[in-house]
Amino acid sequence: RLLRSLMNVRFPGPALNGYMELQDELLTEEAQEKGLVKVEELPTAAEEFGIGQVRNADRMSLWRGDITRLQADAIVNAANSQLLGCFVPCHGCIDNAIHSAAGIQLRNACAELMEEQGHEEPTGKAKITPGYNLPAAHVIHTVGPIVGLKVTEKQKEELKSCYVSCLKLAEKEGLKNIVFCCISTGEFHFPNKLAAEIAVDTADRFLTGSKLERVVFNVFKEEDYNIYKKLFKKALL
């Protein structure tokens, strides 16, 4: 926890000689202890729940657990507009978990992207970096909408744009699979059920005509698992 806290508060920049090797060794060991989960070995939603309204359920999966265990071509990080990860020590957000498991190289890579861009990351776009010490080869970063008292139509479109941007980027990079976290539902307060509906519908439409082989929806809470499960089990009218 001490190392994670120090990583979380550390600003981007070069590390002391020997640090990277020690950090990488420790994070690799931690990843092995947590246990790796291969995306291609996950059952499809069609196998688990049958084929209902989701046409491409045979190319989607639902998995509950720690996203930093997944061996995938890319996992999606629900980032903030600075794109530098969470600076709160040991915070429970997905941004913190992914940066902590990847190592300080991820923040450094994001800082380079942001310096090159010259402004904050807009909502609904996507950027890609290596995964560094994660089992995932890449991290795709996207900034979801922040909801106030009520979800607006603009925010619904922005969330949809997050998914489309990530899917397009994955396809452009020649990736075969992508793992989505629940974008905007945590710290950004997007209603869970509506967010899941947008996620599944957007991915389903995109997969028709796409070369992507698998889209995985990763959830951590039982509430979210049940929401996605109901969407996949929803029968055709």
Regions picked out by a protein language model, each given a short descriptive name:
Residues 1-237:
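Macrodomain-like recognition of ADP-ribose-binding/processing modules
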